[in-house]
Amino acid sequence: MLITQYLHHQRFSPAAIRLRAMTNETETLTSGIDPASFSSVIKPTNDLFRYVNGPWIDTYRLPDDRSRYGSFDKLAEDAENQVRDILDADDCPATKSQALYHSFLNTDAIEAAGLDPIRDELDLIDSAIDKATLTRVLGTINPAGGPDLFGLAVYGDPGDPDRNIAHLEQAGLCLPDEAYYREDHYAPVREAYVAMVATQLVNAGYAPAAESNGGDELPANTGDDESNAPATVPSEAALDMARHFLAVETKIAANHWDNVATRDSVKTYNPTDYADLAATLKNFDLGSWIDAWQTAYDATKAAKAQPIDFKSVFARVIVHEPSFLTGLDAFWAEADLADLKLWARVHMILGFASSLSRDFDTTNFDFYGKVLSGAKKQRDRWKRAVSLVNGVCGEDVGREYVRLHFPESSKRRMEELVANLIDAYRVSITNSDWLGEDTKAKALEKISKFTPKIGYTNHWRDYSALSVSADALPAENAKAANLYETGYQLAKVGKSVDKDEWLMNPQTVNAYYEPSMNVIVFPAAILQPPFFDPKAEDAANYGGIGAVIGHEIGHGFDDQGSQYDGDGKLNNWWTDEDRKNFEARTGALIAQYNSFVPLQLVEKYADEPDKAPHVNGALTIGENIGDLGGVNIALKAYAFALGKAAGKPDAEEDGSPAAIKALLDTAPEMDGFTGLQRFFLSYASIWRTKNRDELTEQYLQIDPHSPAEFRTNGIASNVDLFYDAFGVTEGDAMWLAPKDRVRIW
């Protein structure tokens, strides 16, 4: 799945005229690239990424409210403004979305309410007299968004992908990943985390603020600017309490699987029934928690619209990290009641902080926005309101977004491109020199069952059960949204998977592959320049959206997707020899990426190079396989498109490297670049981005995507046609010896 989001400014110049087979119209097409923006100092043979993007990176200054900006972010910003216009309109048809939006903007009401929106939940936690009572309290407050010791998600059963099932996953932490609790590198982050938690405990009245020299307590956050308000200074007692909280979370984190282990589709597939699960969580008393949850949920409006039998949800579940549950139960047995209440109290506050008054909201941003991500100021409130709407009921406003901003012609062109990419994968698999015939047959069967979804869903979600109001406080609406989403998801358990349901809104600038359904999905908002431009010659589109399409198809054959068959079932369809060959190739790619350090961190750690964080090749291998396959297959698809345009309908019959190169050589030269060169220049442009150091370091720890420079250079250096395109020779920085180039798809 593509996650990172970035900017590219394009200048289009008319360059060629050709006959479009799709429309039978003569059109003036552009090159789709902007040569004036390229570096005059850096050569593509040494650094393709900075040849295309370096001048922009060197001159662009990140706004204070941004931790990153680039091609994806520019399109996301455009969509954000378009959604805002919809929500601001008097005749907005997305009434639930508009209510959430206006509620979040009512800062006077939010400030007046202070902590009141979650005071009842905190009082319940405080009143627990023993662990049994606390278990019931956690069950009572969980449906509306209370603390989670374990996560619950609903989607297809990998063993029976047509049927929905509950998945139980590790949780219980407020830092991004378990490594933040154990690695020395994150000691400064932990120190800042303690200060933030201590401040929130002061804000909530659980600990005193530090006293000034005159003996008076220092003021809480009350400034006009949300990110520059005078800071509450916690007392030593508050800091001690926060340190204790960190120690409690550290014990939970010790049972977490790391983010590489959680990628293993086989090891995380552990079907379990209620009896076994209850036996595993005997000290926690799962049954008592479920009963309290059911009683609380049944008393809500959401239950009337979406009734749930919560115990039946646990009749059969998939446990992702079994040892986590065992460790969690031991933790619960050994922990003091005071520790558990402290954990629950802080999680309740942090979970709702951004919906509460300024003191809570600002303290939350100062850590999660500034320390972890490097932003210097909070985003404008209306932008946060749009993000809230997109997260809670994105299809409600998304339907209007599609009507106003997505032309059906783009959908038709994308359908053509996707079909071409699938055909190119078919040719690549058929011609593979390392796959055996049995595995080839299964791979071809799988790709024949791929289902592309483009633009928007045909099955819009019904939000009638979502009970939100413009007059309600944001935290109250957040609880209602949690209840709605909980009911919506849990109601699926045991039912057939709705393969028309999307996991992204149409206004999302992203794309994804879902292995359990064998679908590839491309929301409307990504189908714009620099990714897709119907006015550009094919090289730019195949290097842009074509590589993205190829990337998503490639996930069906990466380290995770390759374990699922064409019907979405977790099923080993590989021969042992072919799997061994596959792992040898992916192992070489892992080794390459393990050596990469982003240039900005090379510079940051110049005096201590041994401390510079590296890319985790094992964490990013799935996305790197997707990128590498995406580029190689998009090149083939571009070549076949050139062949068809030249009157060679059987161009796909010969997928040999020589035949592909010959077809690519027929592309017109535009703006001084060949078609093959423009393909790679377009590909590099979609990864144009600039990150703050803090965010780059966070991504290296938790993000399965490699940094943009390596999604460009790390991939291109493994593609033989890149060497042909720019004449890369030994001695150039982008050179990899042929024997060291990884070739998979």
Locations of the language-model features?
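Intrinsically disordered, low-complexity linker/terminal regions across diverse proteins
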Residues: 16, 23-26, 76, 251, ...
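Active-site-surrounding "flap" and adjacent substrate/cofactor-binding loops of secreted or lumenal enzymes
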Residues: 25-29, 42-46, 51-109
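Flexible glycine/proline-enriched surface loops and loop-helix/loop-strand junctions
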Residues: 29-34, 174-178, 610-612
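Hydrophobic/aromatic-rich, well-ordered segments within soluble, folded domains that form packed cores
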Residues: 37-58, 180-202, 621, 628-633
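Extracellular/periplasmic catalytic domains that process cell-envelope and extracellular macromolecules
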Residues: 40-44, 158-160, 513-516, 672-674
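Noncatalytic, helix-rich "gating/capping" subdomain that lines the substrate-entry/channel surface
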Residues: 88-416, 420
